[in-house]
């Protein structure tokens, strides 16, 4: 007798359900890789667990977005709403703007000029002239700041040299006074009034007994 059909239904036990999900998920992703390699097929698989965790696989030579675009083109089903269309249009606009900027940059470098009209060449020339003026202005500002900085350093060096010179003069004066036997206490005694000077000890100056 043949095996009877087993009814496919939700597994109630959460532990058994998780184990089965893990095994079946691994099997599906393995089969997706095999058919992609063996048959050179474009395969994209997206799996969400009951907890919302994402598992996916995509053929190495493509991407899920490209596969979805091909699916939308071939099936005629619309996968993207207006919001996504608007976002896609904005991305295309930015890409186009970037391409135009790259072309303009090549023109400013003197590349790919043969296809340009005289009017376009004149506009490039004006842009280059304006750029030269701006560069010269920046260089002048830098030079002026450099001059001011040098002047400040020069003034500071002069002030420092003056202070060092003054200190040398003061030090030289002190050394000269020491060499000549100058003693500040003697000068102080000489400047005192006579009445306050200490008289030398002399027998004639002592009181008679």
From Swiss-Prot:
UniProt KW Nucleus keyword: yes
PROSITE patterns membership: K_BOX, MADS_BOX_1, MADS_BOX_2
Residue ranges constituting the K-box domain according to the UniProt record: 84-170
Domain MADS-box: 1-61
Record's GO cellular component terms: nucleus
Keywords: Activator, Developmental protein, Differentiation, DNA-binding, Flowering, Nucleus, Transcription, Transcription regulation
Pfam families reported in the protein's UniProt record: K-box, SRF-TF
A single BP term in Gene Ontology: positive regulation of transcription by RNA polymerase II
Localization (cell): Nucleus
SUPFAM superfamilies: SRF-like (SSF55455)
Keyword Metal-binding appears in the UniProt entry: no
Disulfide bond positions: none
Family matches, as InterPro entries: MADS-box/MEF2_TF, MEF2-like_N, TF_Kbox, TF_MADSbox, TF_MADSbox_sf
Gene Ontology terms for molecular function: DNA-binding transcription factor activity, RNA polymerase II-specific; protein dimerization activity; RNA polymerase II cis-regulatory region sequence-specific DNA binding
Tissue expr: Highly expressed in anthers and carpels. Expressed in pollen, tapetum and stigma.
Function comment: Probable transcription factor involved in the development of floral organs. B-class protein required for normal development of lodicules (whorl 2).
Listed name of the protein: MADS-box transcription factor 2
Organism the protein comes from: Oryza sativa subsp. japonica (Rice)
């Amino acid at each position: 007798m043949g095996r009877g059909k087993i009814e496919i239904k939700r597994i109630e036990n959460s532990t058994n359900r998780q184990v089965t999900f893990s095994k079946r998920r691994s099997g599906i992703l393995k089969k997706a890789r095999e058919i992609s390699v063996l048959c050179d097929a474009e395969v994209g698989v997206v799996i969400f667990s009951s907890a919302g965790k994402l598992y996916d696989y995509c053929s190495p030579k493509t991407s899920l977005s490209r596969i979805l675009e091909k699916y939308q083109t071939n099936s005629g089903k619309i996968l993207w709403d207006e919001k996504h269309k608007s976002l896609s249009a904005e991305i295309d606009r930015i890409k186009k703007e970037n391409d135009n900027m790259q072309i303009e940059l090549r023109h400013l470098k003197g590349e790919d000029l043969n296809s340009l009209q005289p009017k376009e060449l004149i506009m490039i020339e004006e842009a280059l002239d304006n750029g030269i003026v701006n560069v010269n202005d920046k260089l002048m500002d830098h030079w002026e700041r450099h001059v001011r900085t040098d002047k400040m350093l020069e003034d500071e060096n002069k002030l420092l040299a003056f202070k060092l010179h003054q200190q040398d003069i003061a030090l030289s004066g002190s050394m000269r006074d020491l060499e000549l036997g100058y003693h500040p206490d003697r000068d102080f005694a000489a400047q005192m009034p006579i009445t306050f000077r200490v008289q030398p000890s002399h027998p004639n100056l002592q009181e008679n007994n």
